[in-house]
Amino acid sequence: NLYNIRNLHIPEVCLKWELMDEDYQGRLCNPLNPFVSHKEIESVNNAVMMPAHGPAKNMEYDAVATTHSWVPKRNRSILNTSQRGILEDEQMYQRCCNLFEKFFPSSSYRRPVGISSMVEAMVSRARIDARIDFESGRIKKEEFTEIMKTCSTIEELRRQK
Protein backbone atom coordinates (compact mmCIF):
# COMPACT_ATOMS: atom_id res chain seq x y z
CA ASN A 1 0.00 0.00 0.00
CA LEU A 2 1.47 3.35 -1.06
CA TYR A 3 -0.51 5.29 1.52
CA ASN A 4 0.79 4.58 4.98
CA ILE A 5 2.13 6.67 7.84
CA ARG A 6 5.76 6.17 6.78
CA ASN A 7 5.13 7.63 3.31
CA LEU A 8 3.19 10.76 4.26
CA HIS A 9 6.21 13.02 3.76
CA ILE A 10 6.92 11.75 0.22
CA PRO A 11 5.15 13.56 -2.65
CA GLU A 12 2.56 11.41 -4.40
CA VAL A 13 4.27 11.82 -7.78
CA CYS A 14 7.43 10.22 -6.39
CA LEU A 15 5.50 7.32 -4.89
CA LYS A 16 3.66 6.54 -8.13
CA TRP A 17 6.51 7.33 -10.57
CA GLU A 18 7.26 3.71 -11.48
CA LEU A 19 3.55 3.01 -12.03
CA MET A 20 3.14 5.80 -14.64
CA ASP A 21 3.79 5.49 -18.37
CA GLU A 22 6.38 7.87 -19.88
CA ASP A 23 3.81 10.04 -21.67
CA TYR A 24 1.90 10.66 -18.44
CA GLN A 25 5.16 11.41 -16.57
CA GLY A 26 6.00 14.00 -19.22
CA ARG A 27 2.61 15.70 -18.94
CA LEU A 28 2.61 15.59 -15.15
CA CYS A 29 6.08 17.09 -14.74
CA ASN A 30 5.84 19.69 -17.50
CA PRO A 31 6.35 23.09 -15.79
CA LEU A 32 4.32 24.77 -18.56
CA ASN A 33 1.24 22.70 -17.75
CA PRO A 34 -0.97 25.01 -15.62
CA PHE A 35 -2.99 22.11 -14.20
CA VAL A 36 -0.07 20.48 -12.41
CA SER A 37 1.96 23.50 -11.28
CA HIS A 38 2.45 23.68 -7.54
CA LYS A 39 1.00 26.52 -5.53
CA GLU A 40 3.56 28.89 -4.03
CA ILE A 41 3.79 29.30 -0.29
CA GLU A 42 2.24 32.59 0.67
CA SER A 43 4.22 34.74 3.04
CA VAL A 44 1.63 36.46 5.14
CA ASN A 45 2.11 37.09 8.83
CA ASN A 46 -0.45 38.04 11.42
CA ALA A 47 0.05 40.75 14.00
CA VAL A 48 -2.05 42.14 16.81
CA MET A 49 -2.25 45.91 16.32
CA MET A 50 -2.96 48.06 19.36
CA PRO A 51 -4.55 51.32 18.16
CA ALA A 52 -4.53 54.41 20.38
CA HIS A 53 -8.29 54.12 20.82
CA GLY A 54 -10.45 51.03 20.63
CA PRO A 55 -9.86 47.28 20.82
CA ALA A 56 -6.84 45.41 19.50
CA LYS A 57 -7.10 44.29 15.88
CA ASN A 58 -5.68 41.18 14.29
CA MET A 59 -4.18 42.20 10.93
CA GLU A 60 -2.34 40.47 8.08
CA TYR A 61 0.77 41.92 6.50
CA ASP A 62 3.14 40.85 3.74
CA ALA A 63 6.55 39.70 4.84
CA VAL A 64 9.33 37.39 3.84
CA ALA A 65 8.91 33.80 5.05
CA THR A 66 12.38 33.84 6.61
CA THR A 67 15.24 36.30 6.54
CA HIS A 68 16.71 34.32 3.64
CA SER A 69 13.68 33.78 1.42
CA TRP A 70 11.31 35.93 -0.55
CA VAL A 71 7.76 35.07 -1.63
CA PRO A 72 5.59 38.20 -1.86
CA LYS A 73 1.83 37.66 -1.76
CA ARG A 74 0.55 40.98 -2.96
CA ASN A 75 0.03 42.00 -6.54
CA ARG A 76 -0.01 45.79 -6.37
CA SER A 77 1.22 48.26 -8.93
CA ILE A 78 3.24 50.99 -7.23
CA LEU A 79 5.44 51.99 -10.13
CA ASN A 80 3.87 55.42 -10.61
CA THR A 81 3.65 56.40 -6.96
CA SER A 82 5.96 57.78 -4.31
CA GLN A 83 6.45 54.18 -3.15
CA ARG A 84 8.68 53.33 -6.13
CA GLY A 85 11.82 53.36 -3.94
CA ILE A 86 10.27 50.73 -1.67
CA LEU A 87 9.52 48.55 -4.69
CA GLU A 88 13.12 48.87 -5.92
CA ASP A 89 14.41 47.89 -2.45
CA GLU A 90 12.08 44.88 -2.43
CA GLN A 91 13.26 43.81 -5.89
CA MET A 92 16.90 44.11 -4.83
CA TYR A 93 16.19 42.02 -1.72
CA GLN A 94 14.43 39.45 -3.90
CA ARG A 95 17.54 39.21 -6.12
CA CYS A 96 19.71 38.73 -3.02
CA CYS A 97 17.45 35.95 -1.73
CA ASN A 98 17.41 34.25 -5.14
CA LEU A 99 21.21 34.39 -5.24
CA PHE A 100 21.39 32.98 -1.69
CA GLU A 101 19.12 30.12 -2.76
CA LYS A 102 21.49 29.32 -5.66
CA PHE A 103 24.30 28.89 -3.11
CA PHE A 104 22.12 27.03 -0.58
CA PRO A 105 19.21 25.24 -2.33
CA SER A 106 17.95 23.83 0.99
CA SER A 107 17.19 27.37 2.23
CA SER A 108 13.91 27.29 0.30
CA TYR A 109 12.50 24.62 2.61
CA ARG A 110 14.72 24.74 5.70
CA ARG A 111 15.36 27.93 7.64
CA PRO A 112 19.07 28.77 7.75
CA VAL A 113 20.52 29.14 11.24
CA GLY A 114 23.73 30.70 12.45
CA ILE A 115 25.28 34.08 13.05
CA SER A 116 26.82 34.75 9.62
CA SER A 117 25.32 37.26 7.26
CA MET A 118 24.06 36.17 3.85
CA VAL A 119 27.19 37.59 2.19
CA GLU A 120 29.58 35.85 4.61
CA ALA A 121 27.78 32.53 4.11
CA MET A 122 27.83 32.84 0.29
CA VAL A 123 31.51 33.82 0.17
CA SER A 124 32.40 30.91 2.44
CA ARG A 125 30.36 28.51 0.30
CA ALA A 126 31.92 29.87 -2.91
CA ARG A 127 35.43 29.32 -1.51
CA ILE A 128 34.63 25.76 -0.41
CA ASP A 129 32.93 24.85 -3.71
CA ALA A 130 35.77 26.40 -5.73
CA ARG A 131 38.39 24.42 -3.80
CA ILE A 132 36.44 21.17 -4.28
CA ASP A 133 35.93 21.86 -8.00
CA PHE A 134 39.61 22.77 -8.48
CA GLU A 135 40.91 19.72 -6.61
CA SER A 136 38.58 17.41 -8.55
CA GLY A 137 39.62 18.96 -11.88
CA ARG A 138 36.25 20.50 -12.79
CA ILE A 139 37.73 24.01 -13.01
CA LYS A 140 41.13 25.31 -14.09
CA LYS A 141 43.65 27.12 -11.89
CA GLU A 142 42.80 30.46 -13.56
CA GLU A 143 39.10 30.07 -12.73
CA PHE A 144 39.93 29.04 -9.17
CA THR A 145 42.21 32.08 -8.75
CA GLU A 146 39.52 34.39 -10.15
CA ILE A 147 36.89 33.03 -7.74
CA MET A 148 39.22 33.44 -4.77
CA LYS A 149 40.12 37.00 -5.86
CA THR A 150 36.41 37.89 -6.20
CA CYS A 151 35.70 36.49 -2.72
CA SER A 152 38.59 38.52 -1.27
CA THR A 153 37.30 41.68 -2.98
CA ILE A 154 33.82 41.13 -1.54
CA GLU A 155 35.24 40.62 1.95
CA GLU A 156 37.40 43.75 1.61
CA LEU A 157 34.38 45.83 0.52
CA ARG A 158 32.40 44.53 3.51
CA ARG A 159 35.19 45.54 5.90
CA GLN A 160 35.30 49.06 4.43
CA LYS A 161 31.59 49.63 5.14
Curated annotation (Swiss-Prot):
Any GO MF annotation of the entry: RNA-directed RNA polymerase activity
Reaction it catalyzes: RNA(n) + a ribonucleoside 5'-triphosphate = RNA(n+1) + diphosphate
Pfam families documented for this protein: Flu_PB1
Group of enzyme by EC: transferase
Role according to the record: RNA-dependent RNA polymerase which is responsible for replication and transcription of virus RNA segments. The transcription of viral mRNAs occurs by a unique mechanism called cap-snatching. 5' methylated caps of cellular mRNAs are cleaved after 10-13 nucleotides by PA. In turn, these short capped RNAs are used as primers by PB1 for transcription of viral mRNAs. During virus replication, PB1 initiates RNA synthesis and copy vRNA into complementary RNA (cRNA) which in turn serves as a template for the production of more vRNAs.
Subunit architecture: Influenza RNA polymerase is composed of three subunits: PB1, PB2 and PA. Interacts (via N-terminus) with PA (via C-terminus). Interacts (via C-terminus) with PB2 (via N-terminus); this interaction is essential for transcription initiation. Interacts (via C-terminus) with human PKP2 (via N-terminus); the interaction competitively inhibits the interaction between the RNA polymerase subunits PB1 and PB2.
UniProt protein name: RNA-directed RNA polymerase catalytic subunit
Organism field: Influenza A virus (strain A/Camel/Mongolia/1982 H1N1)
Lineage: Viruses, Riboviria, Orthornavirae, Negarnaviricota, Polyploviricotina
Gene: PB1
